[in-house]
């Protein structure tokens, strides 16, 4: 059990730190939700690559469950979307939903293709 918790925890700490740093790196002139969008897109792309190339169970725990699970954020996406709706900005909320969903699906597909080619 501990042999699984350690890589999972390391990955989670690194993923959460990466998301925080990514949000800090987004310039103030860009809408605040952009950091989470980038995190979700990066995570979607990387999960495609990792799904094709990572076979060892502990590396999967570290990279996919830990790192990408902490890097990406459904809860942040949900809060951003609901906040836009509460601010009576339905077009922005729909754009947020589309960008996160369509972008993530496209990037996961691309990651799978690249991962399969590299494998």
Curated annotation (Swiss-Prot):
Q: Which reaction does it catalyse?
A: fluoride(in) = fluoride(out)
Record-listed Na(+) binding positions = 69, 72
Q: Which UniProt keywords apply?
A: Cell inner membrane, Cell membrane, Ion channel, Ion transport, Membrane, Metal-binding, Sodium, Transmembrane, Transmembrane helix, Transport
Does the keyword field hold Nucleotide-binding? Answer: no
Q: Name one Pfam family in it.
A: CRCB
Where located? Cell inner membrane
MF terms in GO: fluoride channel activity; fluoride transmembrane transporter activity; metal ion binding
GO cellular-component terms in the record?
Answer: plasma membrane
Q: Name one GO biological process term.
A: fluoride transmembrane transport
Transmembrane domains' residue ranges: 5-25, 30-50, 59-79, 97-117
Regulation of its function: Na(+) is not transported, but it plays an essential structural role and its presence is essential for fluoride channel function.
Q: Which InterPro entries match?
A: FluC (IPR003691)
Biological role:
Fluoride-specific ion channel. Important for reducing fluoride concentration in the cell, thus reducing its toxicity.
PANTHER family (UniProt xref): FLUORIDE EXPORT PROTEIN 1-RELATED (PTHR28259:SF1)
Listed name of the protein? Fluoride-specific ion channel FluC
Species of origin reads: Neisseria meningitidis serogroup B (strain ATCC BAA-335 / MC58)
